[in-house]
């Protein structure tokens, strides 16, 4: 017979689990940013992906996947709708045919330019709700 977990443990996890609180906070922030990005036709994840491609030289997939904390398969799936909309292109790396470069197109740059002021305003609003956003940011980065 398996040992049952006491009901009190449910409250312990609810009240103290850092993973649970991080998940809930991430979902709340994602929902908030999704709502404000809707008028420009982006989700919060798409904004982050486009921003990660906003570089002088198109990056290969691997560093972008690392930055966004996703595997290449997930990144490929996330790129598909952006490719269909003409915001991103995936090109063969001329220096190494096995690699792919991720190119932010001009329409991608334009939509990103419209989204950045929205991000700034919403981000400022979120930071104003926090007691110490810089400490929170450092602590979140430390977990990575």
Residue ranges and their predicted role:
Residues 50, 64, 82-85:
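Basic amphipathic alpha-helical segments that dock to polyanions
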Residues 42, 56-59, 70:
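The short coil/loop that forms the "turn" connecting the two helices of the helix-turn-helix
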Residues 21, 48-51, 110:
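Pre-recognition alpha-helix immediately N-terminal to the DNA-recognition helix
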